[in-house]
Amino acid sequence: MEKKPFLTEAMAQEIIEDVPTPFHVYDEKGIRENVRRINKAFSWNKGFKEYFAVKALPNPVILQILKEEGCGVDCSSLTELMLSEACGFTGHEIMFSSNQTPVEDMQKAYELGAYINLDDATMVEFLERVAGVPQEIFCRYNPGGTFQLGESEEGFQVMDKPGDAKYGMTEQQMIDSYKKLMQKGAKQFGIHAFLASNTISDAYYPELAAILFRLAVRVQQATGAHISYINLSGGVGIPYRPEQTENDIMAIGEGVRKKFEEILVPAGMGDVAIFSEMGRFTTGPYGALVSTVIHEKHIYKEYIGLDACAANLMRPAMYGAYHHITVLGKENEPCDHKYDVVGGLCENNDKFAVDRMLPKIDIGDILYIHDTGAHGSAMGYNYNGKLHCAEVLLCEDGSHRLIRRAQTPRDYFATLDFLPFMKPLFED
């Protein structure tokens, strides 16, 4: 699909007058419209709810926007629970999916009345001991082996290997866990699974749904447990590369509906509510990292140096992930120069792009790095003493709003404020 910025050069310059680069910027209109498409795609299911994965974009203003559009939140830590509570999410508006869970995290989830999703069979006794067993509870499923989807000339295209993942229970462990939970007072049950990441295929969710729907029928028959909810989790991806095709959420929703009618309805389970956790799909395309070119270097390769670095967007350095780059104001110029676009970390993998064909770039140009609305700012870090950059909301009316200020040296040193010789750093 064609990669178009939601900011023009003039719009970016207007923001820069208030908020220096680098910063992440989010498109409120795009996010709201996308959530409405998701809700429409699954409107056939009366209990449907999107639980936005907080880890994808843990900004309270964004979470409040999503709440207004009917979303819940998917949390996996104490601080994500605290953030969600502060944004007004309570009870079953919260899904708590964690692994190797600390006591205080589990207790907070129980206190908030969140749906608790148990990652392991041993968590049944752990939950009862540290908090209590709620009447409604989920268990996470891991089918093992290799998840395969689609066919090519070479045969099945492998998408992921659940058998190598640390998450979830076997089917027999789930059956045993449901039986124990029923004995301890649980009355309604959910199933959750995540089998593949960032899939660019309308077939993924329907195929996952079929696996979980059949599992639900078997588990209910084996235990007598009332399966009330099935959480398809995340995995629906976005087209980071221009040559990739955008997922059609309406086709995905219809595919899941067909599996629902084919498998659950004949089993007398037509009242099951469907949940999702599409963090990346929900906000990913509606965020960008805006950065200024501050250096150029000409040695064995041509380098463009930015005021942003991997501390502001980790994915290219960590995964070798592709993020499209637009030089604002030069959208219609030929991409006839080959560059490595880099940041200033003392690590050679601090590269936003390698051998990327772009228009001729000059110092002072503004670069728009696409698709940072999920797992962008959220994965920021402080290595090399680099500071987290600001976050800005492009509002529906075209105005902009600071929704997270940039980190300062005082913030960076805050955990050292008890050391006497560090006090000069905190003096105004």
Place the predicted regions along the sequence by residue.
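Generic secondary-structure signature for well-ordered alpha-helical cores
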Residues: 21, 36, 40-44, 132, ...
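ATP-grasp fold ATP-binding core
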Residues: 136-142
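Conserved beta-strand positions
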Residues: 75, 96, 118, 193-196, ...
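Active-site loop/helix belt of alpha/beta enzymes
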Residues: 146-294, 358, 384
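A charged N-terminal "starter" segment
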Residues: 1-115, 121-135, 150, 181-187, ...
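Conserved, mostly hydrophobic/aromatic
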Residues: 31, 55, 77, 109, ...
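Active-site-proximal loop/turn and secondary-structure-junction residues that shape catalytic pockets
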Residues: 56-58, 79, 100-102, 120-122, ...
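Charged (often Lys/Glu-rich) extended helix/loop segments that serve as interaction or gating elements
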Residues: 261, 265, 269-428
